[in-house]
């Protein structure tokens, strides 16, 4: 990840989810469900196959924007970036750990909330793991 932009921070975390690669990828690729495990997201709505609008609230600051799916390799990788109001990009990788376990690696680069980015990425992955393994929404 390039850290040349001022105020930019990057974080990477990994989690092993006790579910098949297909189940894990399918859950993450339901972009409208991202708020179930990423609490600052209040809503995500599909615009077209590659663009989504979002509403977020991070540290009491509400934001609206659009993110673009720049790469989607089914069962392997999803990459995105925001195209409005600030900058954030990310990529999530899916690797089979065994027949019933999947390794999920999330990398994010952002100008939003840099001091806490690594902790937040870890929290989001933990929420995602619980969502998939328990098939329940995270408040």
Task: Label each residue range with its predicted role.
Residues 1-49, 127, 131:
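Hydrophobic ligand-binding cavity/cleft-lining segments
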Residues 10-12, 62-66, 87-91:
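Short, surface-exposed coil-to-beta transition loops
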Residues 46-53, 72-80:
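Short, hydrophobic/aromatic-rich segments at coil-to-beta transitions
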Residues 68-71, 77-135, 139:
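Beta-strand/loop substructures that line and gate deep hydrophobic ligand-binding cavities in soluble
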């Amino acid at each position: 990840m390039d850290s040349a932009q001022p105020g930019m921070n990057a974080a990477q975390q990994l989690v092993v989810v006790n579910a098949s690669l297909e189940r894990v990828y399918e859950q993450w690729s339901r972009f409208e469900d991202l708020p179930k495990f990423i609490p600052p997201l209040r809503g995500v709505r599909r615009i077209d196959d590659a663009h989504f609008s979002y509403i977020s609230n991070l540290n009491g600051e509400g934001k609206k924007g659009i993110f673009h799916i720049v790469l989607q390799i089914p069962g392997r990788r999803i990459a995105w970036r925001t195209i409005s109001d600030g900058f954030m990009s990310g990529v999530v990788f899916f690797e089979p750990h065994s027949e019933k376990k999947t390794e999920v690696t999330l990398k994010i680069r952002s100008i939003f909330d840099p001091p806490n980015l690594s902790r937040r990425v870890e929290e989001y992955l933990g929420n995602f793991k619980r969502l998939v393994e328990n098939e329940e929404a995270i408040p």
